[in-house]
Regions:
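C-terminal regions of proteins
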Residues: 1-9, 19, 238-330
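Hydrophobic N-terminal alpha-helices or hydrophobic patches in metabolic proteins across all domains
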Residues: 1-61, 77, 175, 198, ...
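Structured, acidic catalytic/metal-binding patches in enzyme active sites
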Residues: 7-131
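Redox-cofactor binding/interface segments in oxidoreductases and associated redox assembly factors
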Residues: 44, 232, 328
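Short, contiguous clusters of charged residues that form electrostatic/catalytic patches at enzyme active sites
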Residues: 67-71, 211-215, 219
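Structural beta-sheet core signal
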Residues: 88, 232, 260-262
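Extended, H/D-rich, highly charged conserved domains that either
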Residues: 96-200, 204-216, 229, 241, ...
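Catalytic core of tubulin tyrosine ligase-like
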Residues: 235
């Protein structure tokens, strides 16, 4: 099986954990091969607005392979007839914090040349960005009258942007990305204002993030559709076709235009995972694999020596149910 065998316009390559360096290094090699077969863009699990200028969020800029990817893209595009594009598809949020929507909405306002005092509605940025604004419903501005007015304003800005579409230019897409990010932040803060126990509230926020990720992926495909397919690289939990994550949403809407390759890990010194038991999914994949390989979905059982604290959960029947193939790193 070869990575170029997959013909989906959006190809999801899952990683089993963010903390095994080999995953991102191999991703770079695989994308270079896909670029030779018509792929024209790659999307990573990083803030979409930050990615407009080649930046990273969620500490992904500290990953050497990510910096190497941007370097390779710049060098490739210096001589390429058809340049390759880099996208982020995540929202500008962390699990327990989210910034103010002010700068995102002000960017759109300035692009449209409007006279709207957004800062008067948002107030101090810290009242939005502090962790208490997410952790305590009583301390979030997400349900305030100003926040509701900002959500109406964000919709109005998007309407004005689309009215400007006949005069489309490169800055229009940048402005739209800021507008959707600002609106998404307002949704996230509104969700944080809903009372409930901690588990319920985190699940609700995760659901909002999944929707924002999916919307970004669909938007990226709208931009890239005429140029070629897109490789999206992220943790398995975001790309799997089952459950309620971004992959499940996108998969339902795109059908067979989306394919998911599940990431699998045999052992890892980086996160302290030893050789898998022979009858586990990973154990069956480990046989005959020297470094890595693409394989059909195997039979087996879920391994128990996982590292949830390092974001590693292992393969299971639910994850594999919608997977087209498995990408196993020995």
């Amino acid at each position: 099986m070869d990575i170029t065998d997959f013909t989906a316009e959006l190809l999801g390559l899952g990683e089993p954990t963010h903390f095994e360096p080999a995953c991102a290094r191999l991703r770079n090699d695989l994308f270079a091969r896909l670029a030779e077969h018509g792929f024209r863009s790659i999307a990573l699990e990083t803030d979409r607005v930050a990615a407009l200028d080649g930046g990273f969020s969620h500490d992904l800029g500290e990953v050497d392979a990510n910096r190497q990817l941007l370097k390779w893209l710049r060098e490739y595009n210096e001589t390429a007839e058809e340049p390759l594009a880099f996208h982020g598809f995540d929202a500008p949020t962390e699990t327990f914090s989210a910034p103010s929507p002010r700068t995102y909405l002000e960017h759109v306002r300035d692009y449209l040349g409007l006279d709207v005092d957004i800062a008067a509605l948002t107030g101090d940025d810290e009242r939005w960005s502090r962790s208490e604004a997410i952790l305590d419903p009583a301390q979030t501005p997400g349900a305030s009258p100003e926040a509701r007015e900002l959500r109406v304003l964000a919709d109005d800005l998007l309407v004005a942007l689309h009215a400007r579409a006949p005069r489309l230019d490169a800055d229009w897409w940048r402005a739209k990305t800021h507008a959707t990010a600002g609106r998404g932040l307002l949704r996230y803060h509104a969700a944080s204002a809903v009372p409930g126990d901690r588990e319920t509230r985190i699940a609700r926020l995760s659901g909002v993030r999944a929707v924002l990720m999916a919307e970004n992926l669909l938007d990226i495909r709208a931009i890239e559709a005429r140029r070629g397919p897109t490789l999206v690289f992220s943790h398995n939990v975001h790309l799997q076709r089952t459950g309620s994550g971004a992959g499940a949403i996108v998969g339902a809407l795109l059908g067979d235009r989306y394919a998911f390759i599940a990431g699998s890990l045999g052992h890892s010194e980086a996160i302290g995972v030893r050789e898998p038991a022979p009858d586990t999914y990973e154990g069956r994949l480990q046989r005959g694999t020297k470094t890595w390989r693409l394989a059909d979905v195997p039979d087996g059982r879920k391994r128990t020596d996982t590292k949830p604290e390092r974001g590693y959960f292992g393969l299971d029947a639910d994850l594999l149910e919608g997977a087209t193939a498995v990408w196993h790193l020995a």
